[in-house]
Design a protein with these regions (language model features):
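Class I S-adenosyl-L-methionine
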Residues: 1-136
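C-terminal target-recognition/interaction regions appended to catalytic cores
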Residues: 77, 81-231
């Protein structure tokens, strides 16, 4: 048995301390053969009483990734494979290197991030971002291709599509002028820094985007334990 009204099962994980706006349906199924008529009551208790007790204050992008070493654009890229380098040599967690960005994208990222930081907000509307994309590429798009993360807000959704490009996950610091690294995506998805990802860079981004955030999974497990311990 699952809830009759699936709206009951929809959660925004940013309300549970994940630094990301991630809405998902979390289904809890209970066997009527085992729980009998209590199944309905238990489901309502899980969604209405227990799970909401694990809500936390919203965490921002800045809180989640702001302490990571800065990665600044190089004046000249290296073999069209490396476009950024660490600004300092302090300890750096694994997978904290950005994908390669060409000079055009680096300039666009810097401009858009500075537009937000300065408060000008010339590119705050969807239409202005569409026009920018067309002016740069000569192509039309029904959706805006660029999005800068805001330091004082949770991130937008971290999707599996991130393996294709990072245009919708631009770092908020204009001086870094880049999209987010694997480690930054992992932090926004609730992975600890000692979690190791295997495969190519694209595989790692896809793995992170497809994951159920482990931090949120732990909260669901704790709420479920509370529900079942007295059954």
């Amino acid at each position: 048995m699952i809830p009759d009204d699936l709206r009951l099962a929809q959660v925004d994980m940013s309300e549970y301390g994940l630094p990301q706006k991630r809405k998902r349906i979390i289904l809890l199924g209970l066997s009527k053969d085992y729980f009998g008529e209590n199944a309905v009551e238990l489901l309502n208790r899980f969604y209405n009483e227990l799970l909401p007790t694990y809500k936390r204050r919203r965490m921002s992008v800045g809180e989640a990734i702001g302490d990571l070493p800065r990665l600044l654009p190089l004046r000249d890229s290296v073999d069209k494979k490396i476009s950024h380098a660490l600004a300092e040599t302090r300890n750096c967690p694994s997978d904290h290197e950005p994908r390669f960005h060409n000079a055009r994208d680096t300039a666009v990222f810097q401009m858009l991030a500075e537009d937000i930081r300065s408060g000008r907000n010339e590119f705050s509307s969807i239409e202005s971002l569409k026009r920018l994309y067309t002016s740069l590429t000569g192509r039309q798009s029904n959706i805006h291709k660029y999005h800068v993360l805001k330091s004082d807000e949770p991130s937008n959704l971290i999707p599996a599509h991130l393996f294709k490009d990072g245009l919708r996950h631009i770092h908020p610091d204009p001086e870094q002028a880049r999209s987010i690294t694997i480690r930054e995506a992992a932090r926004l998805q609730g992975f600890p820094d000692d979690f190791q990802f295997c495969g190519s860079q694209g595989d790692k981004y896809k793995m992170i985007g497809n994951a159920v955030p482990p931090y949120f999974s732990k909260l669901v497990a704790e709420a479920l334990h509370e529900l079942l311990k007295d059954c």
